[in-house]
Design a protein with these regions (language model features):
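Ligand-binding clefts/hinges and TM-proximal coupling segments of bilobed small-molecule sensing domains
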Residues: 25-26, 154-171, 208-209, 238-263
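Extended ligand-binding regions for polar small-molecule ligands
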Residues: 61-73, 138, 152-153, 219-258
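Bilobed "Venus flytrap"/periplasmic-binding protein-like clamshell domains
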Residues: 41-46, 57-73, 105, 125-178, ...
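Short helix-initiation/N-cap motifs at beta->coil->alpha
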Residues: 80-91, 135, 154, 169-179, ...
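Acidic, polar ligand-binding/catalytic clefts
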Residues: 68, 72, 77-141, 207
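Extracytoplasmic small-molecule ligand-binding "clamshell" domains
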Residues: 25-104
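Periplasmic-binding protein-like
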Residues: 43, 121-131, 193, 197-238, ...
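A ligand-binding cleft/hinge motif common to bilobed small-molecule-binding domains
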Residues: 87, 104-112, 158, 182-214
């Protein structure tokens, strides 16, 4: 005959067993309301820890790999929601079109979504066109100088705040700016140093300036009000940083030489 203590213990175990699926269902309802984990990504040949690329079979990138693994842990399929840049992802945050994303964080975006752990810290600078006489920030920040940035991004806002005389113009895609820089129609392009170093290899005569005007931090994010989802993605990224999953995602996407930088 069971003792009262054993009866109480058995009751608690049974209650926990019943409650756990309910908690899991509640999380899935919030983080994957369509039955799929909709991962917002931005497409660009720039690569790096934020951008994804289009491939013959689908998409590749650090957010692509992390989204696939997150969906597997939740037990749901993954669906990639494609955007041209992080500004478009931000604009869609309140429209219910995506569930999770990885993108650069700044105070303006914190009013539109909730951020989890930072997994990348990048140095933002400028690349100047072939044949340019610009050698540093002082010679760049002059009247008549045309600087491009990807529209409505953290880097664009940083460049506008940094440059007092040069004119900063936003464009929708990396590809468009690449063409303008190559043809000499713009004087400079603001982006993270690692991506600009790759661009410099593709456009002979360009030069990446030595100085840094902004530290850009990239983190996982969910829409406002999704507290259960935020708790889940926070644990996911904390685990991914310590168990090698994030390192593997970097290595699989041509970032073997890039360190994982957190706050």
């Amino acid at each position: 005959m069971p003792t009262p203590f054993r009866s109480v213990l058995a009751g608690l175990v049974l209650a926990a067993a019943v409650a756990m699926p309910a908690l899991a269902d509640g999380l899935k309802d919030e983080i994957a309301p369509t039955g799929k984990l909709r991962v917002a990504i931005a497409i660009s040949p720039a690569g790096g820890a934020f951008w994804s690329t289009k491939t013959e079979t689908g998409y590749a990138g650090v957010p692509v790999d992390l989204g696939k693994e997150m969906a597997a842990q939740l037990g749901v399929p993954v669906e990639y929601i494609v955007h041209q840049n992080s500004g478009q992802i931000t604009d869609a945050a309140g429209k219910g079109t995506w569930d999770v994303t990885w993108l650069p964080k700044d105070p303006e975006r914190e009013t539109k979504m909730m951020f989890g752990p930072i997994y990348e810290v990048a140095d933002a600078t400028y690349i100047v066109k072939p044949g340019s006489n610009v050698t540093n920030f002082a010679t760049l920040d002059q009247p008549g100088i045309k600087v491009a940035a990807v529209n409505a991004t953290t880097t664009m806002r940083g460049a506008i705040a940094h440059l007092k005389n040069a004119k900063v113009t936003g464009y929708q895609t990396y590809d468009e700016i690449f063409g303008l820089l190559k043809s000499g129609e713009i004087d400079a392009f603001a982006l993270s140093r690692d991506q600009l170093n790759k661009m410099a290899q593709q456009i002979p005569g360009t030069r990446v300036l030595d100085e840094t005007f902004k530290k850009t931090v990239t983190a996982v994010a969910v829409p406002l009000g999704h507290s259960q989802a935020l708790a889940f993605v926070t644990k996911f990224m904390t685990d991914a940083t310590t168990n090698g999953m994030l390192r593997k995602a970097y290595d699989n996407n041509s970032l073997k030489d890039s360190p994982i930088r957190t706050e």
